[in-house]
């Protein structure tokens, strides 16, 4: 792999060795004006991961800038201590890598695979890998096609298409990057990086607000409107939902940020669950066909008998998503008020304690 290859795949062990052999100093990269563009690119990598799109400059790298910006970007993400951003950054980097890997030669793909401990060989437009390597990275891919039983296996070796092998490498990249966020950023480096975090935090907070996510990036079910709570409860009880209810629930969950795999997991509880059909429906509703659908409004929900158990907040909204966002804002205000009350209460207790201490200190015999 050459310098351009290292820039495209900075998460590889080869790229790390290259940086070490060139004697780059992280202190210099973080502080010296000569590396200003590296730091700006690192910030942009993180911002792009929040936006979720791979842009032109992500695919046409300036080798040195691109390579060195990767560890700086990781440090910026780690400093937020935000699990949702860590997952999102790992996913974005893996998607970026996948786009680049699609243009690699067979040899290039096998080189990257080798870095992850995958020994592969190419034959007749297929890649042949050991079944243990296949299972290691296909385990997190829940679509029925990834089951080993649905693959061609000969003498312990799995035969996969070029695209499938590339998809496995994408998953390997995602897992490696996400697992690497356990290490803490050295304390002496934090002040230098802090100025780059303001825009990142602002962008992340905006995304979470738009998608109705809690602080840790999880969907807050407490804020669901009654109709969606009811549909989800039925699904969890093993009750089959009619098509209109499935469409409403799936589009609602996708609109507030739940990923496809998590939605698929919910439907596994249904008695009539079929992996292939459910996967097709979820893919179609969440944008696999080129259009991401918005969940139906309250009038449509009532028309199909899916509006159940209205409450007071329902009187002020005409759409399940409006209910969710209003509920999220209300919960945020309540939490802020509770925190402020706790702070004032603690302050009052401290004041009383201080007065008692003063009085005790002035009393006879002390």
UniProtKB/Swiss-Prot annotation:
Binds 1 [4Fe-4S] cluster. GO terms for cellular component: primosome complex. Keywords: 4Fe-4S, DNA replication, Iron, Iron-sulfur, Metal-binding, Primosome. InterPro entries: DNA_primase_lsu_euk/arc, DNA_primase_lsu_PriL. The keyword Protein biosynthesis does not apply. Pfam families: DNA_primase_lrg (PF04104). It comes from the Archaea. One of its GO terms (biological process) is DNA replication, synthesis of primer. [4Fe-4S] cluster binds at residues 227, 298, 307, 314. CDD domains: PriL. One of its GO terms (molecular function) is 4 iron, 4 sulfur cluster binding. Its cofactor is [4Fe-4S] cluster. Heterodimer of a small subunit (PriS) and a large subunit (PriL). Belongs to the eukaryotic-type primase large subunit family. Regulatory subunit of DNA primase, an RNA polymerase that catalyzes the synthesis of short RNA molecules used as primers for DNA polymerase during DNA replication. Stabilizes and modulates the activity of the small subunit, increasing the rate of DNA synthesis, and conferring RNA synthesis capability. The DNA polymerase activity may enable DNA primase to also catalyze primer extension after primer synthesis. May also play a role in DNA repair. This is DNA primase large subunit PriL. It comes from Methanocella arvoryzae (strain DSM 22066 / NBRC 105507 / MRE50). The lineage of its organism: Archaea, Methanobacteriati, Methanobacteriota, Stenosarchaea group, Methanomicrobia.
């Amino acid at each position: 792999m050459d310098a351009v290859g290292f820039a495209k795949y900075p998460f590889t062990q080869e790229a790390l060795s290259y940086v070490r052999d060139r004697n780059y100093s992280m202190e210099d990269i973080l502080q010296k004006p000569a590396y200003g563009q590296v730091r700006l690119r690192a910030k942009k990598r993180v911002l792009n991961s929040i936006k979720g799109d791979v842009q032109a400059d992500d695919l046409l790298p300036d080798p040195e800038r691109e390579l060195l910006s990767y560890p700086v970007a990781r440090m910026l993400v780690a400093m937020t201590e935000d699990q949702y951003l860590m997952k999102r950054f790992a996913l974005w980097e893996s998607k970026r890598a996948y786009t680049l890997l699609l243009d690699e030669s067979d040899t290039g793909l096998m080189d990257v695979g080798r870095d992850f401990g995958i020994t592969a060989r190419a034959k007749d437009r297929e890649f042949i890998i050991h079944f243990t390597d296949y299972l290691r990275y296909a385990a997190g891919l829940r679509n029925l096609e990834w089951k080993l039983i649905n693959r061609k296996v000969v003498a312990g070796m799995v035969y996969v298409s070029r695209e499938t092998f590339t998809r496995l490498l994408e998953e390997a990249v995602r897992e490696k990057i996400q697992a690497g966020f356990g290490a803490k950023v050295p304390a002496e480096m934090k002040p230098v990086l802090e100025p780059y975090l303001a825009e990142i935090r602002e962008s992340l907070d905006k995304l979470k607000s738009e998608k109705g996510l809690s602080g840790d990036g999880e969907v807050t079910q407490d804020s669901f409107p009654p109709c969606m709570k009811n549909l989800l409860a039925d699904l969890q009880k093993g009750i089959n939902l009619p098509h209109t209810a499935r469409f409403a629930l799936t589009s609602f969950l996708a609109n507030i940020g739940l990923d496809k795999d998590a939605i698929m997991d919910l439907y596994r509880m249904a008695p009539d669950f079929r992996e292939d059909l459910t996967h097709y429906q979820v893919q179609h509703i969440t944008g696999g066909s080129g259009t991401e659908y918005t969940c139906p409004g309250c009038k449509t929900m009532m028309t199909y008998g899916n509006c159940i158990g209205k409450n007071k907040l329902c009187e002020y909204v005409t759409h399940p998503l409006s209910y969710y966002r209003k509920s999220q804002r209300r919960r945020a205000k309540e939490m802020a008020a509770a925190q402020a009350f706790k702070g004032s209460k603690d302050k009052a207790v401290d004041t009383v304690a201080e007065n008692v201490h003063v009085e005790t200190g002035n009393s006879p015999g002390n």
